[in-house]
């Protein structure tokens, strides 16, 4: 069972599992939107208002819940992460595990939980969140660990690094670059592009969830382990498109809440 199936990551997680022959139920709030998403076509799509306080959804016996849903992901500084997303997501997951029908719960976390770390980080590295989004994720993780002592369920926490690909928000930097190239623009405004970050195609990140349901529960980084500068990634995208555009470096300042260099030190393919 996958929540957030119409989202950027969720749709690719659903497709990864259906391609491997799993029976997948995609819990969505917008059936019409879900029916238009190619990656969901082999899944069973069910309407579910997961944040409804009166939700009475019955989970199938021995099912696996992969929770990708989260609101306001475009704005990491929104107070809604702590005021709405944290309690709403905890209530939904608590309700799910207390039915005692789930064999495992996999939750999508974020590398932003580490805060302004510089360099490689392990899944065991300390967290120091510095945005409402990251703080809410860390608190949810801690609350679920406490809940385990009462409800005894298998919990896997997956900290995602930087992803790109089909379904990404059109206002993210890579879709904006592609749009500028398609529109024949001469320049593309960006920062200096010196950020050294752990980027991976969303399809590869989604496939790693297949491993997460088979290995021991715990906390893992969903990462490539190979950092690349943002400027180099932009050049790589242009090369793949066989197009060129002048990168107007330094037009934007670096965001104070974002790490200038962070990558996962323990990708799953090196652990197992």
Where would I find each of the regions flagged by the language model?
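SDR active-site strand-loop-helix element
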Residues: 3, 27, 68, 105-111, ...
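Active-site helix of classical SDR
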Residues: 132, 136-139
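NAD(P)-dependent short-chain dehydrogenase/reductase
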Residues: 142-197, 202-206, 236-238
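Conserved glycine-rich Rossmann-like NAD(P)H-binding loop of the short-chain dehydrogenase/reductase
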Residues: 22-32
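NAD(P)H-binding glycine-rich loop region in Rossmannoid oxidoreductase-like domains
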Residues: 48-85
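C-terminal substrate-binding subdomain of Rossmann-fold SDR/epimerase-dehydratase oxidoreductases
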Residues: 183-272
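N-terminal Rossmann NAD(P)H-binding glycine-rich loop of SDR-like oxidoreductase domains
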Residues: 1-20
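Conserved Rossmann-fold NAD(P)-dependent oxidoreductase catalytic core, especially the SDR/UDP-sugar
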Residues: 90-132
């Amino acid at each position: 069972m996958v929540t957030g199936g119409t989202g950027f990551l969720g749709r690719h997680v659903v497709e990864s599992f259906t391609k491997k022959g799993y029976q997948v139920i995609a819990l969505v709030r917008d059936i019409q939107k879900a029916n238009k998403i190619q990656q969901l076509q082999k899944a069973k799509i069910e309407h579910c208002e997961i944040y409804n306080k009166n939700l009475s959804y019955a989970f199938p016996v021995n099912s696996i819940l992969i929770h990708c849903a989260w609101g306001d992901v475009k704005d990491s500084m929104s107070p809604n992460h702590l005021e709405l997303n944290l309690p709403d997501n905890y209530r939904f997951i608590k309700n799910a595990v207390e039915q005692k029908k789930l064999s495992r719960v996999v939750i999508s976390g974020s590398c932003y939980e580490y805060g302004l770390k510089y360099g490689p980080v392990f899944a065991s590295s300390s967290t120091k969140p510095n945005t409402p989004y990251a703080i809410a994720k860390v608190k949810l993780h801690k609350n679920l660990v406490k809940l385990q002592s009462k409800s005894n369920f298998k919990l896997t926490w997956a900290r995602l690094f930087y992803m790109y690909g089909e379904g990404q928000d059109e206002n993210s930097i890579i879709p904006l670059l592609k749009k500028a190239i398609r529109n024949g623009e001469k320049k593309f405004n960006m920062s200096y592009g010196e950020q050294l970050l752990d980027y991976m195609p969303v399809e590869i990140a989604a496939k790693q969830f297949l491993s997460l349901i088979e290995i021991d529960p715990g906390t893992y980084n969903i990462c490539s382990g190979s950092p690349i500068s943002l400027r180099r990634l932009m050049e790589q995208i242009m090369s793949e498109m066989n197009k060129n555009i002048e990168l107007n470096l330094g037009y934007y300042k670096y965001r104070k809440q974002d790490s200038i260099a962070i990558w996962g030190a323990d990708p799953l393919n090196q652990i197992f």
